[in-house]
């Protein structure tokens, strides 16, 4: 628990990362203000204050009022709806712009924005990973090895998760030399689509572009958080490592493989919540673009969302 309990606003408190972060902060003794269309979905707790508002629809000045009285503001903002149709470029960036302008009117002492892995640099370069031609295929291959990630994708994105499971099955058959012609066709079609345009590419590129609103700015205290590529529900290990600007890749690049193949790292949403909560309390990464990664070897499907009944002692 922080020596001085804080009043932390969380945009998107009932979502994937936001719900875990709210639970982590409440367990540390902080007060959480949930800001979204339906923040009450998270549950009830004496130190949880829901402030319902539709960020996409209200004027900037009205949104700014929701930030009053906060020590820290964290944006875990994401699409409202499920499915691939929610993964859009422009709506996300317009909402980010609105949030930043509202924060300018009513600033907190520290603003943390949770983006995505796509803005992280390919190690040794200034190129964002999302702009590297090999990133998406390596990413899809990596998440297809994880039942936890597939279950998460099915829960959030429907058909995209279902097709990923079928792709996994086909790749397993191929590796065991039992692949049918149908399996081979599934692999070829799936990977062809990724090479043309991955269904999530626009949204991941939006996260990359969002970082440009922060980069090199020192007019307010901010921190831009990019969870590592294989970010998913999983075990809370309580341990993590930090990287600034670069995507962490493990092992050495093989001669016949691209720079990402078999080398992507990840973190559970529970451990990412710990990393963000630690930064809220310690403020070691002000004006930094950073990532966290951890051990995700225990591949067990876990809830994509938690409620306030997960707070120590329940919602009492």
Task: Label each residue range with its predicted role.
Residues 195, 241-267:
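A conserved pocket-lining segment of Rossmann-fold NAD(P)-dependent short-chain dehydrogenase/reductase
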Residues 2-30:
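N-terminal Rossmann NAD(P)H-binding glycine-rich loop of SDR-like oxidoreductase domains
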Residues 7, 11, 15-16, 257-316:
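Mid/C-terminal beta-alpha module of Rossmann-like enzyme folds, strongest
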Residues 11, 72-76, 113-114:
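Rossmann-fold scaffold of SDR-type NAD(P)-dependent oxidoreductases
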Residues 34, 39-108:
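NAD(P)H-binding glycine-rich loop region in Rossmannoid oxidoreductase-like domains
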Residues 9, 33, 223:
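Conserved beta-strand positions in the Rossmann-like core of class I SAM-dependent methyltransferases
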Residues 81-236, 240:
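Glycine-/Pro-rich loop/turn segments that contact NAD(P) or position catalytic residues
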């Amino acid at each position: 628990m922080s020596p001085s309990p804080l009043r932390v606003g969380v945009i998107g408190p009932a979502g994937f990362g936001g719900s875990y972060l709210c639970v982590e902060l409440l367990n540390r003794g902080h007060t959480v203000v949930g800001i979204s269309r339906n923040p009450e979905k998270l549950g009830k707790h004496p130190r949880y204050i829901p402030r319902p508002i539709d960020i996409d629809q209200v004027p900037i000045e009205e949104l700014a009022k929701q930030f009053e009285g906060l020590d820290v503001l964290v944006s875990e903002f994401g699409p409202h709806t499920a499915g691939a149709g929610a993964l859009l470029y422009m709506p996300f960036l317009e909402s980010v712009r609105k949030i930043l302008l509202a924060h300018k009117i009513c600033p907190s002492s520290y603003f943390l924005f949770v983006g995505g892995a796509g803005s992280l640099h390919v190690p040794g370069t200034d190129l964002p990973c999302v702009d590297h031609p090999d990133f998406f295929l390596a990413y899809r291959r990596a998440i297809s090895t994880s039942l936890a990630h597939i279950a998460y994708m099915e829960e959030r994105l429907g058909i995209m998760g279902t097709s990923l499971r079928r792709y996994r099955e086909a790749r397993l058959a191929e590796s065991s030399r039992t692949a049918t012609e149908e399996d081979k066709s599934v692999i070829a079609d799936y990977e062809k689509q990724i090479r043309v345009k991955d269904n999530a590419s626009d949204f991941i590129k939006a996260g990359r572009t969002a970082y440009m609103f922060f980069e090199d700015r020192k007019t307010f205290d901010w921190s831009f958080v990019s969870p590592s590529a294989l970010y998913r529900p999983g075990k809370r290990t309580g341990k993590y490592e930090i990287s600034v600007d670069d995507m962490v890749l493990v092992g050495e690049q093989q001669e016949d493989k691209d720079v990402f193949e078999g080398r992507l790292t990840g973190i559970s949403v529970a451990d990412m919540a710990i990393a963000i909560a630690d930064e809220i309390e310690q403020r070691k990464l002000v004006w930094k673009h950073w990532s966290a990664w951890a051990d995700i070897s225990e591949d067990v499907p876990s809830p994509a969302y938690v409620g306030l009944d997960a707070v120590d002692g329940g919602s009492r």
